[in-house]
Amino acid sequence: MTAEFISSIEEIIEDQKNGKMVIMVDDESRENEGDLILPAEKVDDKAVNFMAKYGRGLICLPLTASRVRELNLPLMAQNNQERDPTAFTISIEAKEGVTTGISAQDRATTIQTAIDKNKCENDITSPGHVFPLVARDGGVLVRAGHTEASVDLARLSGNIPASVICEIMNDDGTMARVPDLIKFSQKHQIKIGRIVDLISYRLEKDTNIKLTHEGKIDLMQENEFDLKIYESLVDKTEQIVLSKGDVSNGEPVMVRVYAVSYTHLRAHET
């Protein structure tokens, strides 16, 4: 893809923060498609209508796995046989505030109901005209799809981690590829970003671990160490950090890394 037409992830995040749609493209070896993406809390009837009129693809609602559990939404297919499986749940509709459910206003109402933390499964019904997708925990670092990219962008831009996406199709019904997406971008003044760049951004600048436990521990003849346990937000693995003294003064600190073999530990325990 010609670099001059690609915006930085920082620019993409800024537009998402300001309620502007962006186009995200995935790898040519994958779907090789571009999706319109907008944080769900920024979506109104005008946004839905734009996606339906100009995007032309299926309008979907990527949600975190935790939100899907809160809404008690089962997967559409238990045995997903897609080439690049997308986790569709059953379709939904807001229980109140809609008519037939298909209008731009009705779909916007359903979207806002689904992401409202004060709403629960009793506030939606199925089937409907909005198609939730389950984003993998860990985002694009686990699965480099539009579902995960859109939720990552919503979170990184300070919005509720939920998004609305729509594949872009050409006038003749074929899928829009890079040359078509560039023309679409220029016509509608919408920035283009790449999922591969979002992956790099997250690896470099995003916080991918969280502190879960900290305390003191006596080791090696009663020498006291600070103990901290960090959990990966990507794959839930844990890392144990032992430190002694002040390691935050900017001075170089010797670091040793030990790979723990649980098989070896169990062998010694027996």
PLM-predicted stretches and their roles:
Residues 263-270:
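Conserved small/polar residues in nucleotide/adenosyl-binding loops
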Residues 44-103:
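Glycine-rich, N-terminal phosphate-binding loop and its surrounding beta-alpha-beta segment
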